[in-house]
Amino acid sequence: MKTVIIYESKHHGNTKKVCDRVAAECRAELIEAGRVDSNFNWEDYDLIGFASGIAYSKFYDSVSRVAEQIPAGKGTFFIYTCAKNDKDFAAKIKKVVEERGAKCLGSYGCRGFNTYGPLKLIGGMNKSNPNEDELKAAVEFVKKVEETYEK
């Protein structure tokens, strides 16, 4: 099974840290969302992951724009890092890929170090995140998706 994760990671690299671990342990390919163009061959991959930090309760626009191009029938999953992991921040992007006819196989979110706005004045929040347990959980999530996916 060939898996790709299309991602954008800003600020402190929280999402990249999660994606790097998943890529290493699940043999997934990583591609920055800004590098995906009209020549991207979706057929090269069985599973498509979308990963992003969360800004204003949604995935970064660059990742969402790529998701809007996914062909019908593809299996997808979502990974995100956020300041407060209190809801499914992948809900909006899931709807986008479902409307395109892709199959949503789940999402994984964890906290990330955050110094946005006034938080920088106090040194930020979630300084130790994503932590080792969260990285392991992300890997387990993707392994489970890969094991249960049926084309």
What label would you give each PLM region?
Residues 33-37:
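Conserved SAM/SAH-binding loop
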Residues 3-6, 10, 16-17, 24-31, ...:
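FMN-binding flavodoxin-like domain, especially the glycine-rich phosphate-binding loop
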